[in-house]
Amino acid sequence: MSYLVTIIAFIIVFGVLVTVHEYGHMFFAKRAGIMCPEFAIGMGPKIFSFRKNETLYTIRLLPVGGYVRMAGDGLEEPPVEPGMNVKIKLNEENEITHIILDDHHKFQQIEAIEVKKCDFKDDLFIEGITAYDNERHHFKIARKSFFVENGSLVQIAPRDRQFAHKKPWPKFLTLFAGPLFNFILALVLFIGLAYYQGTPTSTVEQVADKYPAQQAGLQKGDKIVQIGKYKISEFDDVDKALDKVKDNKTTVKFERDGKTKSVELTPKKTEKKLTKVSSETKYVLGFQPASEHTLFKPIVFGFKSFLIGSTYIFTAVVGMLASIFTGGFSFDMLNGPVGIYHNVDSVVKAGIISLIGYTALLSVNLGIMNLIPIPALDGGRILFVIYEAIFRKPVNKKAETTIIAIGAIFMVVIMILVTWNDIRRYFL
């Protein structure tokens, strides 16, 4: 049963993170007028799909990513060229609405035509010889029109609906929006957790065994007001004061039953592992703070949690990249789907709150990792847009596509190595 719970939790976490990321791309793409033929969650064979307006929404078998396919985001060419024989369906204005490439269709009242000239990007027309009168005709293509092959519809994308032909700013927004939406999701989750759990105060809720707070006699309900020379008004002040006092003997003042008392104690030094490549030294008294539920403090606390988590993850990612050049790199620094599954298994056992917190951190991590300037990632593609903005011309399309393909192969190889390393670490 625990495996089933972990699998369900993993699928939900993965689905939420990828859906939010890809929706960010699609949201800004559509705002810029870019046609998005497909929105996919997962990779590999399609297991479910539905069409809404011009976009086909699909869920695919392998939980290793997702994508938004945008018109003009590659070297794909229209499947029709002069010399081909196709069938066309016309509307009441005598405009082409469907170009049928085979006999696997259910359309009626269609015309067969041998294509002599055609343009699917700018002038939108087909000129050719029709079978019914063996005469040459010129047909305009409707703005909303489709290629039909094997029963599937692919909407024709004029040049002004293609990603490649947009200005740098909408391109940048479209590419950056994926990571941006991951950051927004993380922030919302952190704030939501703060509202649910309340924000910590400087009042003691519970003391830990064999820690300085217990040894000094602190009790539930004691409100800490000063540590050394540092005044305390909220829980963050406790952490800040202890960072300065470190593990030196100090005086702690607290209020109990309306009276101010003081004790001397020595904070305990602890090491908290944040990621595979970074840890944090903290000095603690060893007490769990009481929480309060207010209207605005959770927003501030959520922002703080987001900034702290983002800083730690950014530092870890920079450290990992630096280790590639300094010789300290290890695949243990990375987690693939198998490693994330293992982490989810551990977090699920701690409860739904821990799972939500882990999802928030994972969302930040996904956003930051996608901004690494590797051609197949959002960060690498943003570099191409920056080049276009600076030099007032886009990177050669063939060169860009080749570089992105090399980057994609590199990422696939890395993913395979990371996955094998995760399997070896956790299951062998």
UniProtKB/Swiss-Prot annotation:
Keywords: Cell membrane, Hydrolase, Membrane, Metal-binding, Metalloprotease, Protease, Transmembrane, Transmembrane helix, Zinc. The active site is at 22. It is a multi-pass membrane protein. Belongs to the peptidase M50B family. Zn(2+) binds at residues 21, 25. This is Putative zinc metalloprotease SACOL1281. Pfam families: PDZ_2 (PF13180), Peptidase_M50 (PF02163). One of its GO terms (molecular function) is metalloendopeptidase activity. Its cofactor is Zn(2+). The chain crosses the membrane at residues 172-194, 309-331, 352-374, 401-420. Its EC number is 3.4.24.-. InterPro entries: PDZ, PDZ_sf, Pept_M50_Zn, Peptidase_M50. The keyword Hydrolase applies.
